[in-house]
Every structure is written in structure tokens, then in C-alpha cells.
Amino acid sequence: MDERLVSGSALGGEAAFEPTLRPQYLHEYIGQDKVKENLQVFIEAAKLREETLDHVLLYGPPGLGKTTLAAIIANEMGVKMRATSGPALERPGDLAALLTSLEPGDVLFIDEIHRLPRTVEEVLYPAMEDYCLDITVGKGPEARSLRLDLPPFTLVGATTRAGALSAPLRDRFGVISRLEYYQVDQLAQIIERAAAILHIIINNEAALELARRARGTPRIANRLLRRVRDFAQVRGDGEITLPLAVEALERLQVDRLGLDHIDHKLLLAIIEKFAGGPVGLETMAAVIGEEAQTIEEVYEPYLLQIGLLQRTPRGRVATPAAYAHLGMEVPKR
């Protein structure tokens, strides 16, 4: 799968760049108002009681700010954050080393927590519940169990697939919050904030145009801003105006709904080769040359969300809105 400009996941090089644009405190964080307001209450209450914050699970599509919120929680609590990911914790010893290095009150952030191996996850249960670590020393008949006390800490887990979490792990989180896609006006604010940090001149009309094509996702909005800046510096006078933004986005093959060439390829395959559907997932994967899992987990969610695609018991169907967006007539059935 090629790296897509409109992918919600971080692309190569962005992990080092994104921290410069991230807000540090809740009052700087744009959008997700309900989540933000609730977190503010929970954080203030924990500080008043001089306790650690309950464990927090953040879930939702990629690129919406889960990692940013984890860092904000640590900043608001006045503690350090240690960050890792589910796939990085391959053995129980990997997690044990992290847990024993924490200081009282620290935030441990585990991204992609649904990908924790089961053996590692089981070590996490007593750590979350009782702030202790059960380890086995020795092998065979001489093996014995030791219990190590851990400092109180807050686990912040992030996942794009909350349903993939086991019930025992999910039940140990005191705070569970879903992050939603952003509104266009919120994304425009995020773009204007990033532009100010990066010393980019952009007018409000251009910011709104980028926001409309950012698929409700701040990471994509910031990525489009940086790419359009290149066009402004080379093809213009450095300022991002509406005409320049439109031209740059068209050259980048990001249309007015935020669809790229792969989205178009998928919709056109359903319409032109299967008369609009229904078509099975495996068949569609073979036709466009992608894995079925990639289509289902990466390409389809946004098309479903904006009403261009439907999943039916018989397969995928292109909606009348998809025909209209592509400038095609809906066939009479």
C-alpha cells in the first residue's frame, strides 16, 4: 500500500515533525469538546484529592489526537509521560521494565493497545488494578512467584479498534472516551494555528478549503497545509490564497470531498465493472489489486461515513451520491 496524502496514520518523517504542532494543555486543544470537558473535571478532581488520575482509554480513527491528549493529560497532572506501543511490547519483561521505571503519578501511554500480546496483557491486569507486578523466578519445580509493588500511575491506552480489546482489559479503564471526526470550522482553526507556528501566511478562505478536504482529521489537515505551502513558495509569492490552494490540491489529486486517486479507483471499479454493485469484498480486492483487509479497514470507513458507499449482505454498493460526485448518471434498474 502506497503512503497516501489523505491517510489518517502518520507517514514517514511525521513522528519527528508533529510534536512542534501539538497543543500542550487542554485550553489550547481545539475540538472534541465533550471529551475535553470531562477530562478537565477528572483531572481537577484527581489533583484536589492528591491522587493519580484513573486509567484512560482513548479510541477512534487515526489522526484525531489521541497521542496529543495523552501528553496533555501528563502536562495537566504535572507529571512525566512514558510512551510505547502494543507491538513494541513483545514479552512480559518488556512491560515489566517500563513499569518499574515509572515514578509516582507518571502517565504510561500505550498506543495501539489492542495489539498487546495476551501474555503481556495479563501482566498489565494487577499493575492497573493493584499497582503491583507478579513475576516468576526460576523454572520448573523450583519456580516461585514474587510480587513487586509499583508506584501509582495512570495508563492511557489508545486504539483505533476498541472492539478488539479484551473485556478484562477494557473493564480496567475508569475513563473511556471516543474521539470523533472534526467539523470543518474546527479544522480551519487547527490549520490557522499550525500556519502561525510554521510562519505560513494563509487566508481564512484557503484554510477552510484545506479543512473541507482533510476528511475530518487534524493530521491530514496539517499535512495538506505543508504540501500546499510548497506550491505557494514555488508557484506563488509564499501566501496561500484560495485559488492557489485549489490548484495545489487538484495537482495533489485530493478532490473537494478529500478523496484521492485510490478512492476514485475503488468507486469506479464498483460502478463501471459491477454496475454499481453489490460486489463482494474479495472480488473487489482482486479487481483493484489491494488486500481485502486494507480495503475494509483503510479505504472504506471514510467512504461509508460520507455516504458514497454502502455495505449490504450481498456486498458493497455505490450510492447515488457516489455517482453524483463522480459526475455520472445513476443507472435505471
Swiss-Prot record:
Region (Large ATPase domain (RuvB-L)), start-end ranges: 1-182
Domain of life: Bacteria
Region of interest called Small ATPAse domain (RuvB-S), as start-end residue ranges on this chain: 183-253
Residues binding ATP, per UniProt: L21, R22, G63, K66, T67, T68, E129, D130, Y131, R172, Y182, R219
Catalytic function, reaction form: ATP + H2O = ADP + phosphate + H(+)
SMART domains, A to Z: AAA (SM00382)
KW tRNA processing (keyword) present: no
EC number: 3.6.4.-
Entry keyword set: ATP-binding, Cytoplasm, DNA damage, DNA recombination, DNA repair, DNA-binding, Hydrolase, Nucleotide-binding
Binding site for DNA: R311, R316
Compartmental location: Cytoplasm
Job description of the protein: The RuvA-RuvB-RuvC complex processes Holliday junction (HJ) DNA during genetic recombination and DNA repair, while the RuvA-RuvB complex plays an important role in the rescue of blocked DNA replication forks via replication fork reversal (RFR). RuvA specifically binds to HJ cruciform DNA, conferring on it an open structure. The RuvB hexamer acts as an ATP-dependent pump, pulling dsDNA into and through the RuvAB complex. RuvB forms 2 homohexamers on either side of HJ DNA bound by 1 or 2 RuvA tetramers; 4 subunits per hexamer contact DNA at a time.
Family to which the UniProt record says this protein belongs: Belongs to the RuvB family.
NCBIfam families assigned: PRK00080.1, ruvB
Entry note about domains: Has 3 domains, the large (RuvB-L) and small ATPase (RuvB-S) domains and the C-terminal head (RuvB-H) domain. The head domain binds DNA, while the ATPase domains jointly bind ATP, ADP or are empty depending on the state of the subunit in the translocation cycle. During a single DNA translocation step the structure of each domain remains the same, but their relative positions change.
Full protein name: Holliday junction branch migration complex subunit RuvB
Naturally occurring in which organism (per UniProt): Geobacillus thermodenitrificans (strain NG80-2)
Annotated gene: ruvB
